[in-house]
């Protein structure tokens, strides 16, 4: 399947800035990947002494393979990049557009455990405006990968800057990392905040302060 123009532009912009997720070219179809993942997951679970003949476990390798390819890591495949609606700003709207409390679930690329949080995204319209739900879909696409929060924040920013043809975009993410909460230090109360600011959100203190004040969760 040919990639959409939006997917091609966003991927090129991320590669140009060194912000693309480290990944190899695709050499198999989604169904082929599921078969291979299921096989290897069966071996892993067996090495952990789990009895895969038990009716509670026998479908677990298949379920994990499907979950990886179709759901939690679907953002590794630009064939899944959301259909984007960008229109000319004919009404001349020039005030901040902000979408907040965007639910976000990703996966830590170091331990493959959950990152759970909320995102706020804002932009100042110039020549183009974007369908509001498309912002949520872009956040979800990049979250559906093994990630680090810093890169995720920047990927969302660059994607929207590219599609909207403006630098005036801001992204803030607050998230709980289960690699901190459920293992290692086992801190159940801490969270991590990252911001990525472009254009006037970075250069103008008043605009930056307005965004950050309104983006408080």
Swiss-Prot record:
<dbReference type="InterPro" id="IPR018234">
    <property type="entry name" value="GTP_CycHdrlase_I_CS"/>
</dbReference>
<feature type="binding site">
    <location>
        <position position="179"/>
    </location>
    <ligand>
        <name>Zn(2+)</name>
    </ligand>
</feature>
<keyword id="KW-0547">Nucleotide-binding</keyword>
<comment type="pathway">
    <text>Cofactor biosynthesis; 7,8-dihydroneopterin triphosphate biosynthesis; 7,8-dihydroneopterin triphosphate from GTP: step 1/1.</text>
</comment>
<protein>
    <recommendedName>
        <fullName>GTP cyclohydrolase 1</fullName>
        <ecNumber>3.5.4.16</ecNumber>
    </recommendedName>
</protein>
<keyword id="KW-0554">One-carbon metabolism</keyword>
<feature type="binding site">
    <location>
        <position position="111"/>
    </location>
    <ligand>
        <name>Zn(2+)</name>
    </ligand>
</feature>
<dbReference type="GO" id="GO:0003934">
    <property type="term" value="F:GTP cyclohydrolase I activity"/>
</dbReference>
<feature type="binding site">
    <location>
        <position position="108"/>
    </location>
    <ligand>
        <name>Zn(2+)</name>
    </ligand>
</feature>
<dbReference type="InterPro" id="IPR043133">
    <property type="entry name" value="GTP-CH-I_C/QueF"/>
</dbReference>
<dbReference type="GO" id="GO:0046654">
    <property type="term" value="P:tetrahydrofolate biosynthetic process"/>
</dbReference>
<comment type="subunit">
    <text>Toroid-shaped homodecamer, composed of two pentamers of five dimers.</text>
</comment>
<comment type="similarity">
    <text>Belongs to the GTP cyclohydrolase I family.</text>
</comment>
<keyword id="KW-0342">GTP-binding</keyword>
<keyword id="KW-0479">Metal-binding</keyword>
<dbReference type="InterPro" id="IPR043134">
    <property type="entry name" value="GTP-CH-I_N"/>
</dbReference>
<dbReference type="GO" id="GO:0008270">
    <property type="term" value="F:zinc ion binding"/>
</dbReference>
<dbReference type="Pfam" id="PF01227">
    <property type="entry name" value="GTP_cyclohydroI"/>
</dbReference>
<dbReference type="GO" id="GO:0006730">
    <property type="term" value="P:one-carbon metabolic process"/>
</dbReference>
<keyword id="KW-0862">Zinc</keyword>
<dbReference type="InterPro" id="IPR020602">
    <property type="entry name" value="GTP_CycHdrlase_I_dom"/>
</dbReference>
<dbReference type="GO" id="GO:0006729">
    <property type="term" value="P:tetrahydrobiopterin biosynthetic process"/>
</dbReference>
<dbReference type="InterPro" id="IPR001474">
    <property type="entry name" value="GTP_CycHdrlase_I"/>
</dbReference>
<dbReference type="GO" id="GO:0005737">
    <property type="term" value="C:cytoplasm"/>
</dbReference>
<keyword id="KW-0378">Hydrolase</keyword>
<dbReference type="GO" id="GO:0005525">
    <property type="term" value="F:GTP binding"/>
</dbReference>
